[in-house]
Amino acid sequence: MSRVTLSRYLIEQTRSNNTPADLRFLIEVVARACKEISHAVSKGALGGVLGSMGTENVQGEVQKKLDVISNEILLEANEWGGHLAGMASEEMDNAYQIPGKYPKGAYLLVFDPLDGSSNIDINAPVGTIFSVLRCPNEYLSQNEALNEKAFLQPGTEQVAAGYAIYGPQTMLVLTLGDGVKGFTLDREMGSFVLTHEDITIPETTQEFAVNMSNQRHWEAPVQRYVSELLAGEDGPLKKNYNMRWVAAMVADVHRILTRGGLFMYPRDSREPSKPGKLRLMYEANPMSFLVEQAGGASTDGHQRILDIQPEGLHQRVAVYLGSKEEVERATAYHKE
């Protein structure tokens, strides 16, 4: 039986599910950019790509060389194809305008070019997260600059989302709104090949992922919930849990999509004006879309993340996502 490449899968989606051809082309271009990023990441010290740039992004985070390289790869790959009205990235303060010499399309691409880049220098997994939205008609123009308000749509408006994870294998995990598929990069073929047909998250779990060093800063409902997880079979939940933490959202969520679990990044008291650390538009929304499509759940502790109306490109949120039973339990504690 012949293997199904990403290109073949997308063509079949166009035929059977009426996936628009321009969306298919856009996903293929993003995938090609991810292959190029994977190649740059794999070179490591041999390619002179390790270390920091000495600059900060809009989040106030020090930019790694590979943050900037990955951002440029995605911009250059996607700006000329005629599929996009604009792009936005973790590494840029403002939306990226499609150069006037290129035609504009109907979609918006939002991405974190290299999630978990603090892991680069220790050779741990990193990844690229992306979200695709339709550009509202009132903001579509071939001649005028794109208004950033075009991007401020709730996650329910996403038409596609996914991530590439650069680990022992490079994988692309994708949803078009009809389940979640996983594609592994065959470097000999140069193609992503369908290897995970129907990714599903179990409703129950005995694993959780959270940065325990922040425990003293958490709100009371989170303190209560995590203490119950740690109490194991002697506590109110009556079962033992294991904790995992990779310090890259893409890697922790990939594990949850592979075998279940709960990922948490709660808000804390150090920056009370900020509702969380992770960014809604290009981290929480695409990952929540994937998790829900795989049968899991995702909230900010109070409401479904995909229902949140964004107020800015770089808005932050608290995140609880993964196996439905545990997400619902953590959310219920916030409402008591």
UniProtKB/Swiss-Prot annotation:
Name the domain of life. Answer: Bacteria
Where Mg(2+) 2 binds, per the record, is at D112, D115, E283
| Record keywords, A-Z | Carbohydrate metabolism, Cytoplasm, Hydrolase, Magnesium, Metal-binding
Task: Extract the Pfam families matched here.
Answer: FBPase (PF00316), FBPase_C (PF18913)
Entry GO MF terms: fructose 1,6-bisphosphate 1-phosphatase activity; magnesium ion binding
On whether Signal is a keyword of this UniProt record, the answer is no
Top EC class per UniProt? hydrolase
* Gene3D superfamilies in the cross-refs: 3.40.190.80, Fructose-1,6-Bisphosphatase, subunit A, domain 1
Give a yes or no for keyword Metal-binding in this entry: yes
**Residues noted as binding substrate in the record, renumbered to the chain:** D115, G116, S117, S118, N211, K277
Signal peptide span per the entry?
none
Q: What is the UniProt remark on how the cofactor binds and its stoichiometry?
A: Binds 2 magnesium ions per subunit.
GO biological process, alphabetically ordered: fructose 1,6-bisphosphate metabolic process; fructose 6-phosphate metabolic process; fructose metabolic process; gluconeogenesis; sucrose biosynthetic process
InterPro entries assigned to the protein according to its UniProt record, in alphabetical order: FBPase_C_dom, FBPase_class-1, FBPase_N, FBPtase
Q: What reaction(s) does this enzyme catalyze?
A: beta-D-fructose 1,6-bisphosphate + H2O = beta-D-fructose 6-phosphate + phosphate
Question: For this UniProt entry, what's an example GO CC term?
Answer: cytosol
**Which cofactors are named for this entry?**
Mg(2+)
Q: Cross-referenced HAMAP family, in alphabetical order?
A: FBPase_class1 (MF_01855)
Under the subunit heading, UniProt states: Homotetramer.
Name the chain's protein. Answer: Fructose-1,6-bisphosphatase class 1
